[in-house]
Amino acid sequence: MSKVMKPSNGKGSRKSSKAATPDTKNFFHAKKKDPVNQDKANNASQITPTVPHSHPSDMVIPDHLAELIPELYSFQQLVDSEKRLDHFIHLRNLHMKRMVAQWERSKLSQEFLYPHLNFPNVKFLRIFISNVSENQPWQMDTNNEADLMALENATWTMRIEGRLLDNVQANDPAREKFSSFIESIVVDFKNKENDNVPSTKFNAAPEENATEGPSDKKLNLNLPLQFSLPNGDNSTTTNTDQNNATMGEETAKKDMSSTTPKLESVKWQYDPNNPVDFDGLDIKRVGSENVECTISILRKSSPEEPFMSYSPQLTAIIGLKSGTSHDAIFSIYKYIHLNELLTNDESAFENLMGNRNNHNSNTSTSKMLDAASSQVSIVKLDTQLITLLPSSLKESSPDTMKLTDLLSLINSTHLLPLQPIEIDYTVRVDKASTYGELVLDIEVPDVNALKFNNTQRESQIGAAELNENARELEQIKPKIALQDKEITSVLSNLHESNKRYRFFKKISEDPVKALNECIASTSNALKVLSGDEGYNEDMVRRANFYKENEAMLRENIEVILSNGRM
């Protein structure tokens, strides 16, 4: 088979070809004769470029450095606390992920069984507070004597009504009434101090018209008919008018006090034995003056998850003002666990038991003590936990306390009933109606949404907390990384300064020995970087080699890392 050749450029190309032949032969000949140079050339082409030096990621403090700088002990405590906190957060995230995974597996079946799964656990109850006025003086014709005599019938009616904000029709018989969400309603009226004393204006009117004689319109608003004299005898008119004026003044005083009587408090309390369903509560009273009052509305707590208020001492520790008893116990246990206040040393608690005899404990606490007698956990009381103790125990200044006693103390003393919603309201009689002027929305528990079991509800809460924690962690990660970078830079500078300090200290103590060690170390580093270790292959394969030469190997690795060779 013939070989196709490309046309050459003529003599010049042949000449250059012949001239290149001896050089090429000499090159291959030299390459075969000098394999060492060939290996060096290959090694030079395979050497990786120097990697830029990065900041170290560890925060290890050597013992000799901690001895020189005592403040590093506090830094080490912060590092240990950070490790414990990271450990707790990691365990908490694993717990929530496990709950979310269990909930996701049964999500389809639970959505079929419980249609309210995707709804929140609270609803909103809209409350309207208003009043209407009837037979008030401004509603009457003052020129009509009959209307003036009927002023004692002036009344007002205050109405407190509520409606759940949902899609249920008002005429639906299954609709939840206003009373089903309320535990109690209390209305406290603020009575004036001089209710039974006639006003200054009333007393001043007869004095101005004393020379004109008494007037029926001003004095005798409800004068009986038998006191008037139809015969028109002028001789007796003056005496009769004086008697009428006296009786009219007494009657007017009585009427004046009756129009502003002392109002007693009104209270409605839910009775489980005799429940009453209603959408509004009406309070009707006699009066022709504005009345100030305070309305207290206490929401009904859910049986599945009773809601309670926390004491100020407990709030200062766990950071929550209200919640369930489970939330309070779990939060206080987290506080004890994070601060490492839990111990199993029971001997330190014996002295406290003698001082606790005067403290009244409930039956549940005694039962818990008996149940926990076989296995007791002791809590070290810090300054925060001491604030939870009653005054009888604070006087003895205890250092420790049983965990069961502490939890029972929280349940009995620091879990308070849910505080009512207080509203200041003024009953206005200068308007026919104030409907729509005062409207407020309050949160009430959704009974249907709270019918799930605790595991499913915790799974939903855990999923929300997991997402919230992940988002917050992503937001603070750059700040943490920046602070870690600054800390590691400071530690790196401390290490470098420590090396210089130790080097110059050795030179000051024994210059010859220190310089010889420095030369040997530099020579060893050069040998490591050049790759000429000089180790026997059989020795390197044995585990004892690494155990016996650990310090030397660590130094070699540090040399390679510091020069960017790895």
From Swiss-Prot:
Compartments (UniProt record): Nucleus
Polar residues compositional bias, start-end: 39-51
Entry keywords, A to Z: Activator, Nucleus, Transcription, Transcription regulation
Chain segments carrying region Disordered: 1-56, 196-260
SUPFAM superfamilies registered for this protein in UniProt: SWIB/MDM2 domain
Molecular function GO labels: structural constituent of chromatin
Compositional bias ranges of the Low complexity kind: 231-246
One GO process term, biological-process aspect: positive regulation of transcription by RNA polymerase II
GO cellular component: chromatin; cytosol; nucleus; SWI/SNF complex
InterPro entries to which the protein is assigned, alphabetical: SWIB_MDM2_dom_sf (IPR036885)
Protein role: Involved in transcriptional activation. Component of the SWI/SNF complex, an ATP-dependent chromatin remodeling complex, which is required for the positive and negative regulation of gene expression of a large number of genes. It changes chromatin structure by altering DNA-histone contacts within a nucleosome, leading eventually to a change in nucleosome position, thus facilitating or repressing binding of gene-specific transcription factors.
Quaternary structure and partners: Interacts with SWP82. Component of the SWI/SNF global transcription activator complex. The 1.14 MDa SWI/SNF complex is composed of 11 different subunits: one copy each of SWI1, SNF2/SWI2, SNF5, SNF12/SWP73, ARP7/SWP61, ARP9/SWP59; two copies each of SWI3, SNF6, SNF11, SWP82; and three copies of TAF14/SWP29.
Similarity comment text for this entry: To yeast RSC6.
Protein name: Transcription regulatory protein SNF12
Organism: Saccharomyces cerevisiae (strain ATCC 204508 / S288c) (Baker's yeast)
Gene designation per UniProt: SNF12
